[in-house]
From Swiss-Prot:
GO terms for molecular function: nuclease activity. GO terms for biological process: rRNA 5'-end processing. The keyword Nuclease applies. This is Putative pre-16S rRNA nuclease. The keyword ATP-binding does not apply. HAMAP family: Nuclease_YqgF (MF_00651). It comes from Buchnera aphidicola subsp. Acyrthosiphon pisum (strain APS) (Acyrthosiphon pisum symbiotic bacterium).
Amino acid sequence: MIVIAFDFGIKKIGVAVGENITKKGRPLSVLNAQNGCPNWQLVKNLIQYWQPQFIVVGLPLNINGTKQKITNKSEKFANLLKYKFNIVVKMHDERLTTVEAKSIIFKKNGFKGLKEEKIHSCAAVIILESWFNQY
C-alpha cells in the first residue's frame, strides 16, 4: 500500500512517499506555499503519479499536546486534500519531527546540509515512518 505524507508549513510543505510492507519512506519534494496554500496542480500531479491509498498530514502540537497557531491551518490543509482529491487523509502527531530531521541531516551533511527544503522533506519521511510504526 502506497502512502504520501505531508509536513505542512506556511511557506514550505515537505512531501514523502512510502509503503507499508517495508514501513519506509523517502523524500519526494518540497512544495512552495503561500500562507499554507500550495500549488494544487502540483499536489494533484503527485497524487495521480503515486496513487496512494491515503495521505498522512503532520499534526503540529505543542510538547504538552495542546494546539499551536498552525494546527488549525494544517487541519484545513488536510480537509482540502480530502475534498479536492476524494482521498482519505489521516492526521499524525508531528511533535519534534523538525528537530529530528535537522539532527539527521546535520549528522550526514553538517551545517551545509541544513537547507529548508531538505528539512521539510525529511520531516515528512519521519511523519510517515512514525505513522507506519504506530499502525
